[in-house]
Amino acid sequence: MKTAHELRPGNVIMLDGSPWVVQKTETTRSGRNAAIVKLKLKHVLQDSSTESTFKGEDKMEDIILERLDCTYSYFADPMYVFMDAEYNQYDVEAENLGDAAAYIVDGMEENCQVTFYEGKAISVELPTSVVREVTYTEPSARGDTSGKVMKPATITGGGTLSVADFVKTGDMIEIDTRTNEFKKRV
């Protein structure tokens, strides 16, 4: 059993007797009340999705599924194809990846974990951090440097996130894939 706060994209939970893949999590904390967790869920067996809200300490039944370490191979619209060490290929639907699709790029060296339910590849868990190139960001703002100054940036793969003011186009940065946050320049 996991609490709602411990769930991450790619986890599979049993909700109302059905398996659901967590595609996105958003935690909101307030000063007096408990944390609230919004989950974007996709049904494993049917083509439906939903958003649900839970208290941070609500218990969820985490389904133990088969997981394989795989590397990204190629994109065949609408499927991402991953390959294991024995050269077996597994197709994962693009919509099952959720926000993770922004970090999957050709030639990526990081291994991913492909999750299977009843023999079907249903989701992909990325490593906790990846290194990507900044393809576009605005130049630094001079003078406005009190506190932590962040600016938007686009990375290889098309994802966007906020980066530190000193990051320039062409820089390699490390990103936390669980929170979509800039960690450091590499």
UniProtKB/Swiss-Prot annotation:
It is found in: Cytoplasm. This is Elongation factor P. Pathway: Protein biosynthesis; polypeptide chain elongation. Belongs to the elongation factor P family. NCBIfam families: efp, PRK00529.1. Disulfide bonds: none annotated. GO terms for molecular function: translation elongation factor activity. It comes from Shewanella pealeana (strain ATCC 700345 / ANG-SQ1). It holds the Pfam family EFP. Keywords: Cytoplasm, Elongation factor, Protein biosynthesis. One of its GO terms (cellular component) is cytoplasm. The keyword Cytoplasm applies. One of its GO terms (biological process) is peptide biosynthetic process. InterPro entries: Elong-fact-P_C, NA-bd_OB-fold, Rib_uL2_dom2, Transl_elong_fac_P/YeiP, Transl_elong_KOW-like, Transl_elong_P/YeiP_cen, Transl_elongation_fac_P, Translation_prot_SH3-like_sf. It comes from the Bacteria.
